[in-house]
Amino acid sequence: MFRVTGIATARAVALQPFRAPLGVIRRFGISATASYEFQHGHDMQSRNGSRWDSRRQGDRRSSRWEGRGSDREDGERGSRGGMWRKPQGRRGRTDGAAREGFSLGPNTEVVRVADEAAGVESTPRTLVEEGVLSNELYEMLQSRGFDKLTPVQQKTLKPILQTEHDVVARAKTGTGKTLAFLMPLFQRLLEGPPSENVKAVVIAPTRDLAAQIFNEINEMRNANRKLRRFNAVVMMGGSSRTETFRSLERRRPNIVVATPGRLIDMLEACGPKYFTEVDFKVLDEADTLLEIGFKQALEQINDILNQLNQKGTTHIRTLLVSATLDDKVQSLANSIMNHAKCLFIDTVDPNEQATNENIAQKVVISKDFADNITASLYKIREEASANPKLKAIVFMPTIVAVEYWGELLQSQCRGTPVLLFHGGLSQGRRNSTMKRFRAMDSGILVCTDVAARGMDVSDVQHVYQVGVPTSPDNYIHRIGRTGRAGRKGSSTIFLAEHELCILDILRRKNNVVISDQETFDAAAQELSDVREAFSLDRDRLHDFLLKNLSFYRGSQGEYDFPLEAYISIARAYGTLLGDSNQRLTLSGRMLTTFVPNHPAVCSLFNIIGPVNSKSSYGFRDTNKRHRRGRLDDSGRLEYSKKRHSYARSYSPSISDGF
């Protein structure tokens, strides 16, 4: 057995509801999660079409600049029209489990597993010799070329297999955590009597991740003939409900991988027939499940499975795996854990930065938005030209950005395949795109955050991010698409000066310091062909910039952008067209959907129709003084060094604290 240390004291966690639903949701009365599923390919349907009003909860700050929704997806906040409120700033959520000790309610004792006792030096062979792992699983690992276990697998396998407690594990992405929770499921199936009922349920936040876990299960089964008798089925929205019933009846699976909505659908329809013998429920990417808004659905799944179980309502073990463990994850764990004792396994050193140490990180800093979007296209084109074997992923904030910028990259990188991937695609199209990208020796995938978590493409060399991610946490998950399974990888984020606040957030919250910093000087580069590409389709450029403005509005609560951010995007239209007199056009009624109603910003747009007088920036400014700065003679904003030191003219150096 292993040694345990540090029994945590229980404490209650108070939650506050999320306050910024999409304007579309309010207009049509659709719940936040149902609308999210409808737009972005996540599974929130129930059998009778009921709506799961699983509002996001926790201490994440809602957007204070409220405007109607955009095409943002996968963890991005929407907003509604209304009065601006003073931004409260982004202090960031603390990772309570890592810094204060993971704790649950008064009925559950949390036991922290010591690293050295969890089997840090374990190998597949030693686990077989100790009777922890079966020969079948050992042969499966050998046939797949896995002679060693990853650190995450070494720390988690023995605690899971040698106890009957619930388990919460914190692990970085790309560290082999999927295999770490699948091997115990197969081990228990090998040890138990034959059964035609479901013995384990694995819940994933997205269809793509569910499909990936299902494929991993099939690879394990195909690697050893004795494992093939344990069938598995994947159930997710977007697929035929009738076909799901047929698969359950025909295959009689022992393992079910599902997204929450479709799982509830099947439990309501045929739970007593197939789900009465469940021993395990696994929540993969638990933080993502909560960010999307699945908390109530997960609690309902837990209640149904407990009620159906023949061995009692407290029989099912819970394995919860997450890259981050904030108060929201602790609250979820507290509501779905069945056993009196929960093991907490933290595979991340609290003094270690949250990103994978195998990933070389870099930031390219540009003066403004126009230079930043130009720098990203220019730099990635040059890298693809210099490295014909480049295999990379480029993350953009919105669907429109993926389609517009991605097609520009396709026109610039003639010899490199460029694929587009986002939540607006059908599930079949998404599956075929990922299958094609995995099979490529070289190529570039341009995508939204739908691919940021859990998606495994083992040979990605470089991850690029254009602008700030939808949340600072997503920076960690995005770059986790490279440097997987012990390989080396590279990451580059392109930022305008007004976006540098994210570097400070990453440093304070995640202990991530990007020391490799480069300033992009547009004047020193030959960019005529790149700038010409932006001017070929003015309408699409116009739409692209408006969607970026809307994204900024929705992310205001995360980053507390200065007014200069909106001014920079507004001026980008004329800059990219090569004509400073060109302006973006906005309806007065929709003005505050995209920008704060401030003279310094509004003067840069062609505004059609009257501006809604009730929608204001929050003050009347007759002296042209801004709440956090003032306008200089040229109309640019000057900022207080105390509050917005990152908004100054930036010269990159480590001494700046980034």
UniProtKB/Swiss-Prot annotation:
UniProt-listed Gene3D superfamilies: P-loop containing nucleotide triphosphate hydrolases
Helicase ATP-binding domain boundaries: 158-343
Motif, Q motif: chain positions: 126-154
GO cellular component: mitochondrial ribosome; mitochondrion
SMART domains recorded: DEXDc, HELICc
Biological process (GO), any one: mRNA processing
Keyword Iron-sulfur set for record: no
Segments forming domain Helicase C-terminal: 372-528
Transit peptide: 1-35
Compartment annotation: Mitochondrion matrix
Record motif DEAD box, residues: 284-287
Renumbered residue ranges of the record's region Disordered: 40-104
Residue ranges with Basic and acidic residues bias: 40-79
GO molecular function, one term: ATP hydrolysis activity
EC number in record: 3.6.4.13
Key word Transcription present: no
SUPFAM superfamilies associated with the record: P-loop containing nucleoside triphosphate hydrolases
Keyword tags: ATP-binding, Helicase, Hydrolase, Mitochondrion, mRNA processing, mRNA splicing, Nucleotide-binding, RNA-binding, Transit peptide, Translation regulation
Signal peptide: none
PROSITE patterns found in the cross-reference section: HELICASE_ATP_BIND_1, HELICASE_CTER, Q_MOTIF
Functional note: ATP-dependent RNA helicase required for mitochondrial splicing of group I and II introns. Also required for efficient mitochondrial translation.
Domain characteristics, as noted in the entry: The Q motif is unique to and characteristic of the DEAD box family of RNA helicases and controls ATP binding and hydrolysis.
Family named by the database record: Belongs to the DEAD box helicase family. DDX18/HAS1 subfamily.
The protein's name: ATP-dependent RNA helicase MSS116, mitochondrial
